[in-house]
Amino acid sequence: MTKTWPPRTVIRKSGGLRGMRTLESALHRGGLGPVAGVDEVGRGACAGPLVVAACVLGPGRIASLAALDDSKKLSEQAREKLFPLICRYAVAYHVVFIPSAEVDRRGVHVANIEGMRRAVAGLAVRPGYVLSDGFRVPGLPMPSLPVIGGDAAAACIAAASVLAKVSRDRVMVALDADHPGYGFAEHKGYSTPAHSRALARLGPCPQHRYSFINVRRVASGSNTAEVADGQPDPRDGTAQTGEGRWSKSSHPATMRATGRAQGT
């Protein structure tokens, strides 16, 4: 029997972990496993890396992550508790860090898609199917499906979102020590009023994305009250993508970015 795309009923959202298990279980029953979820964090930030994670959860391991949910709905404390559990129970996971300079050169959206491809390619276990959070990911060597609100609909995407969020937050805390005064540990590089004031006062640092309008205005000396917009320049984002990675030698905040659960 030829493996093919799942029927539309597979991607219907149901509440809670039960709904997350339903989606992946259907794919496994159809012979399409292992199923990988992929998600990103940091698209809208005007400073810091774009972080993309891919995660494979075996069908028998999702129950061990009862607290799993969309990372945006979880408190920082809950995410930190889930992070080591996901690393422990995941069949495989991989986290990719794309630095600000790379985002500027490639563009936010295209860098994000390339990051998703690289995250999937870095998995220690080759998935039979990939679920992405909202974005179609062309160029994957296996079938894939974008799921709107995927981090609340599929456990593997939710797990990837937690891995990406915690990884990025830890990097931003370390960058706060490297670049004092911007408040990276608090706002994580997003365009809050406090960040905008610090940016206007100190000017951009190497971690800022010059493709974002507010950063470009400050850098050019034309800072205005609109500096808090924090949106990428629409003229950017059409070039090819690439990927940069943090390593232990290049940054103290970097953690083990690739994993495979023991005994798998």
Curated annotation (Swiss-Prot):
<feature type="region of interest" description="Disordered">
    <location>
        <begin position="222"/>
        <end position="264"/>
    </location>
</feature>
<dbReference type="GO" id="GO:0043137">
    <property type="term" value="P:DNA replication, removal of RNA primer"/>
</dbReference>
<feature type="binding site">
    <location>
        <position position="40"/>
    </location>
    <ligand>
        <name>a divalent metal cation</name>
    </ligand>
</feature>
<protein>
    <recommendedName>
        <fullName>Ribonuclease HII</fullName>
        <ecNumber>3.1.26.4</ecNumber>
    </recommendedName>
</protein>
<dbReference type="GO" id="GO:0030145">
    <property type="term" value="F:manganese ion binding"/>
</dbReference>
<keyword id="KW-0479">Metal-binding</keyword>
<keyword id="KW-0963">Cytoplasm</keyword>
<dbReference type="InterPro" id="IPR022898">
    <property type="entry name" value="RNase_HII"/>
</dbReference>
<dbReference type="Pfam" id="PF01351">
    <property type="entry name" value="RNase_HII"/>
</dbReference>
<comment type="function">
    <text>Endonuclease that specifically degrades the RNA of RNA-DNA hybrids.</text>
</comment>
<keyword id="KW-0540">Nuclease</keyword>
<keyword id="KW-0255">Endonuclease</keyword>
<feature type="domain" description="RNase H type-2">
    <location>
        <begin position="33"/>
        <end position="224"/>
    </location>
</feature>
<keyword id="KW-0378">Hydrolase</keyword>
<dbReference type="InterPro" id="IPR036397">
    <property type="entry name" value="RNaseH_sf"/>
</dbReference>
<comment type="similarity">
    <text>Belongs to the RNase HII family.</text>
</comment>
<dbReference type="GO" id="GO:0004523">
    <property type="term" value="F:RNA-DNA hybrid ribonuclease activity"/>
</dbReference>
<keyword id="KW-0464">Manganese</keyword>
<dbReference type="GO" id="GO:0006298">
    <property type="term" value="P:mismatch repair"/>
</dbReference>
<feature type="binding site">
    <location>
        <position position="133"/>
    </location>
    <ligand>
        <name>a divalent metal cation</name>
    </ligand>
</feature>
<dbReference type="GO" id="GO:0032299">
    <property type="term" value="C:ribonuclease H2 complex"/>
</dbReference>
<dbReference type="InterPro" id="IPR012337">
    <property type="entry name" value="RNaseH-like_sf"/>
</dbReference>
<dbReference type="InterPro" id="IPR024567">
    <property type="entry name" value="RNase_HII/HIII_dom"/>
</dbReference>
<dbReference type="InterPro" id="IPR001352">
    <property type="entry name" value="RNase_HII/HIII"/>
</dbReference>
<dbReference type="GO" id="GO:0003723">
    <property type="term" value="F:RNA binding"/>
</dbReference>
<feature type="binding site">
    <location>
        <position position="39"/>
    </location>
    <ligand>
        <name>a divalent metal cation</name>
    </ligand>
</feature>
<dbReference type="GO" id="GO:0005737">
    <property type="term" value="C:cytoplasm"/>
</dbReference>
